[in-house]
Amino acid sequence: MSTLQEKINQTIVDVIDFPIEGIVYKDITPLFLNSELSNEIVDAFVEKAKGKVDIVCGIESRGFLYGIQIAQKLKVPFVLIRKAGKLPPPTISQSYDLEYGQATIEVNSNYIKDGARVLIHDDVLATGGTAEACAKLVEKCGGKTTQFSFIVDLTFLHGKDKLTSFTTDIVTLTEY
């Protein structure tokens, strides 16, 4: 019998030279073709988050796919964190640095209440920049990030280093 990590690793597809030459892209979309495996993934995240969170925030866009299911199973609200200009007001925004430039994310400022314990979910942890910006956004709203969860951790990019100042509870199901 395979472990969940082995099943995930067998399902994720390496795409060579995407999105640019020299990059090996970890394509998680085949996970969504297997409903049984997807349920196992969601259940694994739920088990790690039980009793620890009041809200699940999903990062646009692949953080929405399992994030909403995690929230539903935990019976807590699901909040979208989106690129700037995609949510109606009132919003709070947070900018962060990219390799070449900046990006900005937003959340509806009414949805994260003071003292809320927040799980931030996304598909892949790379440099940690987006997740770090999300945690700063949660703080601006008065919440506290109590857990991060990712399907994949690209450990060679050291993304966890940017997140441990918010919480050391960082759940990943596999790493490369």
Language model: regions and residue ranges:
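PRPP-associated nucleotide enzymes
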Residues: 1-176
